[in-house]
Design a protein with these regions (language model features):
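N-terminal secretory signal peptides that target proteins for export/translocation
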Residues: 1-2
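Sec-dependent N-terminal signal peptides
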Residues: 5-14
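Structured beta-strand-rich core segments of catalytic domains in phosphoester-bond hydrolases
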Residues: 67-158
């Protein structure tokens, strides 16, 4: 009986050792940030876009976000963020024309860490493939999405 138990332990150990892989867990630091549109009245109160975006960039750099989503961001704000964050790029289109006009729900990602496998945008409406308002919305609502692959590990995330 003792010999059978010993053989069983050796067999199980051998199987477990054979199953060992080089899998390394991937840590992913993500965030979502409502940047708030560049509203002129905010500047009068001291928290305009010109005051906010350097602080936002510092927060992103401090936390070393791999990927972060944005809301309420116009094209010029995206350009400011990209300039303030070398090593990041973004995906996403404007909600008004599917190109550059209107607010974006862009996704920033670290270009040294990720490749884009696939990306897209859709509108929250009855016609999700074209810029449009849905149901009871006052303005068009857009969703941007991306499928990324980690350059080092091959890990994929959407």
């Amino acid at each position: 009986m003792k010999l059978k138990n010993l053989l069983l332990i050796v067999l199980v150990s051998a199987v477990l050792c054979a199953c060992h892989s080089n899998y390394q867990p991937t840590t992913l630091t993500v965030a979502s940030y409502n940047l708030r549109n560049a509203n002129g009245s905010d500047s009068a109160r001291g928290n305009g876009w010109g005051q906010r975006y350097p602080v936002i960039a510092q927060i992103v750099q401090y936390h070393d976000f791999d990927i972060f989503g944005t809301q309420e961001c116009f094209l010029h704000q995206l350009k400011d963020m990209k300039k303030a964050l070398p090593g990041y790029d973004y995906i996403g289109v404007g909600r008004d024309d599917g190109k550059e006009k209107g607010e974006h729900s862009a996704i920033f990602y670290r270009t040294d860490k990720f490749d884009i496998i696939e990306k897209g945008d859709f509108w929250l409406s009855e016609t999700p493939d074209v810029p449009s308002k849905g149901w009871d919305a006052v303005l068009p609502r857009i969703c941007s999405w991306g499928h990324f692959k980690c350059k080092d590990t091959g890990f994929e995330v959407s």
